[in-house]
């Protein structure tokens, strides 16, 4: 098993974001093993209003405390619920209201885990570094800190961290980024950590196990409308465009239809002005494909960004394979990206993250699509 070798670290204090999961648990252990002075910090980012979510958060805190007790380190707690509401949740609602599909985890990393958390660790806990259980790697070879993909290609989380600056990366450690997930679980089991077989968390943290539609409808009024084929035929009703995203296949409520084949139906467009959900058959329907996109709200890790006309690769959603592309600037905060080959289900509101081989360059928010 490829453990990270201990290094000579004297009196450097690291505050580890302890979530109650296996990745942060092993991160704390590895940093102790390397000789750091380690303390944990458990963040409460959401005020739970029902029993299941409250219990889940309480269980996470209990697991985080058990791991810290086992490792012999302090666990601090902090409540960032108001910061989360103002900076993450309100953005999430505004994007859905505008018909886009945001990624709140990316905003949470930007505003909470690597901003509010870092400030608290600095001001209150006198930290030299913070550490998280993310599957990314840090490189300092160029003279400034840069972010590389995690060693485990299936778990690489650089897509979610592209908004970090090289200054933030220089203050952050990512101990599990050099490991495979299976190795992380093996270490946790060997060390007798209660989190060794705990399921990975999935979905949006403030929704938890609740139905997404039920949750969203408590904050945004639904506006039902027609479902139409790309040819304009009305074939059903939707309960609100905000409940649907491009490329979606499940939950459309479209049964078998006369004169149509057996190919599954996909959301291929959302026409906000008419409140119409447009669907087509097949995952490569022409309305679902794009040859490129425009993006804004740019963030480059090194502050400069790639050169105009750079030929690099891009991910337009997590776990998507990299797609080769050419990037050109349309102004200080807008880019045009053309794929080498058409891509399905590129979605406004989602993040486009750019890479040069293993190096994460940064990215932006997809604003509009280029169909041809």
Curated annotation (Swiss-Prot):
Transmembrane segments: none annotated. It is an enzyme of class 2 (transferase). GO terms for cellular component: cytoplasm. Pfam families: tRNA_Me_trans, tRNA_Me_trans_C, tRNA_Me_trans_M. Residues 103-105 are annotated as: Interaction with target base in tRNA. It catalyses: S-sulfanyl-L-cysteinyl-[protein] + uridine(34) in tRNA + AH2 + ATP = 2-thiouridine(34) in tRNA + L-cysteinyl-[protein] + A + AMP + diphosphate + H(+). ATP binds at residues 17-24, 43, 133. Residues 155-157, 317-318 are annotated as: Interaction with tRNA. Catalyzes the 2-thiolation of uridine at the wobble position (U34) of tRNA, leading to the formation of s(2)U34. Belongs to the MnmA/TRMU family. This is tRNA-specific 2-thiouridylase MnmA. It comes from Shewanella sediminis (strain HAW-EB3). The lineage of its organism: Bacteria, Pseudomonadati, Pseudomonadota, Gammaproteobacteria, Alteromonadales.
């Amino acid at each position: 098993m490829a453990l990270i070798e201990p290094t000579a670290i004297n009196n450097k204090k690291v505050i580890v974001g302890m979530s109650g999961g296996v990745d942060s648990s092993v991160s704390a252990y590895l940093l102790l093993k390397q000789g750091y002075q380690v303390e944990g910090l458990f963040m409460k980012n959401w005020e739970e209003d029902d029993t299941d979510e409250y219990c889940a958060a309480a269980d996470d805190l209990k697991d985080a405390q058990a791991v810290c007790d086992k490792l012999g380190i302090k666990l601090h707690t902090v409540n960032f619920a108001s910061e989360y509401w103002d900076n993450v949740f309100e953005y999430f609602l505004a994007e859905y209201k505008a018909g886009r599909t945001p990624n709140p985890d990316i905003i949470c990393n930007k505003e909470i885990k690597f901003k509010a958390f870092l400030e608290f660790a600095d001001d209150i806990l006198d930290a030299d570094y913070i550490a998280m259980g993310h599957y990314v790697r840090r490189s300092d070879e160029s003279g400034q800190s840069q972010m590389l993909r995690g060693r485990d290609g299936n778990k690489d989380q650089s897509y979610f961290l592209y908004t970090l600056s090289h200054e933030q990366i220089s203050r952050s450690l990512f101990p599990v980024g050099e490991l495979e997930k299976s190795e992380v679980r093996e270490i946790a089991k060997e060390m007798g950590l209660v989190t060794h077989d705990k399921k990975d968390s999935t979905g949006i943290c403030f929704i938890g196990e609740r139905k997404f539609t039920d949750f969203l409808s408590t904050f945004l009024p639904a506006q039902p409308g027609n479902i139409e084929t790309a040819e304009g035929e009305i074939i059903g009703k939707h309960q609100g465009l905000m409940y649907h995203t491009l490329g979606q296949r499940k939950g459309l409520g479209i049964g078998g239809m006369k004169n149509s084949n057996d190919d599954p139906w996909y959301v291929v467009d959302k026409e906000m002005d008419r409140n119409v959900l447009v669907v087509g058959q097949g995952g490569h329907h022409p309305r679902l494909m794009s040859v490129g996109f425009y993006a804004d709200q740019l963030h480059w890790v090194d502050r400069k960004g790639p050169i105009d006309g750079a030929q690099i690769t891009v991910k337009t959603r997590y776990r998507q394979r990299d797609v080769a592309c050419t990037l050109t600037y349309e102004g200080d905060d807008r880019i045009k990206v053309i794929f080498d080959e058409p891509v399905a289900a590129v979605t406004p509101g989602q993040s486009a993250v750019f890479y040069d081989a293993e190096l994460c360059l940064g990215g932006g928010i997809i604003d509009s699509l280029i169909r041809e």
